[in-house]
Each structure stands twice: as structure tokens, then as C-alpha cells.
Design a protein with these regions (language model features):
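Cysteine-centered motifs
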Residues: 9-11
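Alpha-helical, largely C-terminal catalytic domains
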Residues: 18-201
Length: 201
């Protein structure tokens, strides 16, 4: 069971973890390096479809998605602390695997690669924290809780916003239409669908 008090509380029960040994500090440093590597991982969908410089990175996407998650979760009355953690973690495995698009690999193979990568990254953290982060990340992958379902929709909403950003920079709508279509198809939350509809007008 995940370590939040109950469904109505956004608080976690963890005692402070002090890094008393040099090897622990080195492990944390290794974790931070993986986080930083996301700045150099381009979002593969843009890379394949658009011929432009300075493509959005996975780190760019994760930050925007996290801010959107914080606001929209508060508006929906969900567990915002959990969804913010989930948003920060949801693409972390891509620091090792790269951004794998759904049509480039079988779904089970993609899940397996990302599962292995996430465990490799999290092994640098104290055990209880690593276990919690993996469970939150896995909750997103399974997509059965309210927070995970909302975040999947936000992930696509952020993609649509980024596509519109590129359109405003001069990229033709025709080149971006597949991204708008995907967002329209996969965003399930009605409030987010309204945001998307208003945004696209």
C-alpha cells in the first residue's frame, strides 16, 4: 500500500533520510545525473515529424505537464501531491531508453524496457523512497486510479499545447494535425476536453 495517510490527505509519512556516507551521496549524484539527461532527450514525435531546431525535450515536457497537473488536480479535487510526483516521474525512464514512440516498438517490449530502466535509476535512492517512487510510476503505467487517468489526459493536452506553439511559430497545421488528432482521441476527462476545444478554436 502506498504511504499516504488516506484519500483526502496529500501528506506522506517518511522520516528524514540523512546521507551519512560518501557512497550514499554518490548514489544521489547518479540519480540527479539521470534527471539532467532528460534535457538532452528530444521528444521523438516532434523529431520524426518536424524539421526544426531546438525541439522540445522530455525535461521540457515533464515540467509543463507537472505544472498543468498541479493546477488541474487542485481543480478536480484529487490528490495533488501524488499527481505532481507522478508527473515528475512519468517519463524519467526515458533518460535511459530515449523517447520510444508507440508505433516504433511492441507495447510489451516498451513496458519491459522502461520497467528495467526505472528500476536501474531508482536503485540510487534510499529503499523506501525508491519503492514509493516506483509504485507511483507503475500506477501511472497501469492507468487505473483517478490521478493516473487524469495525468494521461494532461500528457496529451500538453502535447496539443506544444503543437499549437509550433503552429504559431510557423509550422503548418497539416504537419501537426496528427498530434491534434491524438489529443482529441485520447483525452478522456470532460473538463480537459473543453480546454482543448476552446484552445483549438
Amino acid at each position: 500500500e502506498l504511504p499516504w495517510h488516506n484519500g483526502n490527505c496529500n501528506c506522506y509519512e517518511f522520516k528524514p533520510v540523512f546521507l551519512k556516507h560518501l557512497e550514499h551521496n554518490k548514489m544521489i549524484e547518479n540519480f540527479f545525473k539521470k534527471v539532467l539527461e532528460l534535457k538532452n532527450v528530444p521528444r521523438q514525435g516532434w523529431k520524426e515529424k518536424l524539421e526544426i531546431d531546438n525541439l522540445e525535450s522530455v525535461a521540457d515536457h515533464s515540467y509543463s505537464t507537472t505544472v498543468m497537473s498541479m493546477i488541474l488536480s487542485d481543480m478536480e479535487g484529487l490528490n495533488t501531491e501524488k499527481i505532481v510526483r507522478m508527473a515528475l516521474l512519468h517519463d524519467l525512464a526515458e533518460s535511459i531508453t530515449g523517447d520510444i514512440t508507440p508505433d516504433s516498438i511492441r507495447k510489451n517490449e516498451k513496458i519491459n524496457k522502461e520497467n528495467i530502466a526505472m528500476k536501474q535509476i531508482l536503485k540510487n535512492l534510499p529503499n523506501k523512497i525508491a519503492e514509493m517512487y516506483f509504485e507511483i510510476w507503475n500506477e501511472y503505467q497501469k492507468n487505473f486510479t483517478e490521478e493516473a487517468i487524469l495525468l494521461h489526459s494532461i500528457d496529451k493536452l500538453e502535447m496539443a499545447f506544444q503543437a499549437k506553439f509550433y503552429q504559431n511559430k510557423g509550422i503548418s497545421k497539416e504537419k501537426l494535425q496528427t498530434f491534434f488528432n491524438t489529443a482529441n482521441k485520447e483525452i478522456k476527462n470532460e473538463n480537459l476536453r473543453k480546454i482543448l476545444s476552446n484552445f483549438m478554436e
